[in-house]
Amino acid sequence: MPHDKIVPEDEQYLFAHPEPGRSCYDTHADGTPVRYSSRRRPLFNVRPGFPNWLTGSYRHFPVDMYIIEWLEHVGIGYHVATDEDFEREGRALTDRYTTIVTGSHPEYWTRNGLDLLEGYLNAGGRIMYLGGNGFYWVTSQLRDKPWIIEVRRDNSGTRCWDAPYGERTHVATREAGGIWRSRGRAPNKMLGVGFASEGWSKGCGYRRLDASYHSPAASLFAGVNEAIVGDYGYVLGGAVGDEVDRFDIALGSPEHAYVLATSTGLGNEYQLVIEDLTLSLPDQGGAQRPDMVRSDLVLFAIDGGGWVFSVGSITYGGALAWNGCDNGLSRLTANVVHAFTGKGPVLGET
């Protein structure tokens, strides 16, 4: 029997009060997409410990707090920078740091932001991408009002609405909207992994691959005795879950990368992303297409001295914090951050 629909109090308030504004996932009353949003909008459901309606678990800001908790546990000093900080200060900001650690879901990036990160890596910077579905949508900021963003989904990617014909070019920057992959900048090229699947049932862990045992990168697994890491966590029960990214050479992932581990297997609640489908086909879930519906743990060097460590999963932070941060995944990630921030070579390279 169907269940009664229950609308949470915060959603009831937003239905009755239009003054807080809408997000870029909404449509207007006439059905047209909402293309602009602002960080000045009051957010009633974003705070530490607030469960997300989609998963019944944590998402976004609460998961980022697990990453902060983990950084403090392993004794790594950090500063927090926002999108506006990046846009305003550029390399003057990033060049002060050896390593940039992303949040759990860095989905919306501007062209300037991507250029900044690429320049930082090419100059020897290190990035730890500790999330999933990152660097996905073409995003613009208004020059005179940088707290406002513009998103035009351009009928591409896994999306919540379509941009009508004639309305797919950003007003702020006069560039085409859509996903960066369609613009020739798939995140695989810079981060080694890119969006592969989404689903909001139970997560899973990573199964270590040969590179984690028999390559220079094996040194990062010091203190990690498990063959499967991250099969635990405060978010969906595993380090791999929610929205996940895979290593894919066809999409630009570097051939020289160390693929250290891959997800142990997601269920059919996790479906292949739309941009990977050319036909409407059955059997595109995690159990039927583990070759595509997966998350990969990847490490690679950049010409010029830069390094990238990518995990390809939104729920990773919840596994880092598991058991008071005393677990194999936490030790692995701590080894990476110490290697990235230390004064010596990352893997003994000269």
Which stretches of residues belong to each language-model region?
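A broadly tuned preference for mixed-charge, low-complexity surface segments
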Residues: 1-27, 123-128, 133-136, 150-163, ...
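Sequence-level detector for tyrosine residue identity
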Residues: 13, 25, 36, 58, ...
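Intrinsic-disorder/low-complexity accessory segments
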Residues: 1, 6, 60-66, 103-104, ...
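Helical hinge/lid and interdomain linker segments adjacent to catalytic or ligand-binding clefts
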Residues: 56-143, 320, 348-349
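Residue-identity detector for threonine
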Residues: 27, 32, 55, 82, ...
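Glycine-rich, aromatic-lined ligand/substrate-binding cores of catalytic
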Residues: 144-147, 152-335, 339-340
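Generic signal for short, ordered secondary-structure residues
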Residues: 50, 96-99, 290
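Aromatic-Pro/Gly-enriched surface loop or interdomain linker
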Residues: 1-93, 345-347
